[in-house]
Amino acid sequence: MVVIYIMSNKQGLIILISGPSGVGKGTIVSRLLSDNNLKLNVSISATTRKKRASEVEGVHYFFKTKEEFEQMIANNQLLEYANYVNNYYGTPLSLVKEILDKNENLILEIEYQGVIQVLRKGFRTLSIFVLPPSEDELVARLKKRGTENDEVIKHRLEQAVKEYAHRELYDHTIINDDLEKTIEDIKQLILKYNQ
């Protein structure tokens, strides 16, 4: 069942940022969040993953059992969700509505499967697909991280090809060859969509 929410003009915008691993999504989102003029918020995700010692319930995640999470799915209580490495992750709809009802914006760093789910809900959205300047540059960025071996990098590149095939889902595509320009371009899009 698809549930569509009718939003008024006074409600905020959901900004969806996607792109291959290593393109700079996390840095972009972090920098955008520091600009108070954009009225951006992040939502705390729900997950079935085990809580780590340093994590706090309701601060880092809402920790759920598999049964609780599946009940949230059945009750349409999630904006989007995915199963990753045998654990569910999702964005609680109640928090999304709370943010948007305050005429503030929600920003999500999200894969294309999640974008499809969000678009089906009927909220006002701005979706942006971020690309690297080239495949060689993407490989260089992934290697520079120093956290992935060649096999993982190969897998991430295969995933990037799959993600790129879905770029038509997005309102805008931006090539991140200059971080400052990319951030400024996205800021201008957010301001334009919020007029």
From Swiss-Prot:
EC number: 2.7.4.8
Major location (coarse): cytoplasm
Top-level taxon of origin: Bacteria
GO MF annotations in UniProt: ATP binding; guanylate kinase activity
One Pfam family linked to the record: Guanylate_kin
UniProt KW Mitochondrion keyword: no
One GO term describing the cellular component: cytosol
Localization in the cell: Cytoplasm
Catalytic activity field: GMP + ATP = GDP + ADP
Protein name as catalogued: Guanylate kinase
Source organism of the structure: Mycoplasmoides gallisepticum (strain R(low / passage 15 / clone 2))
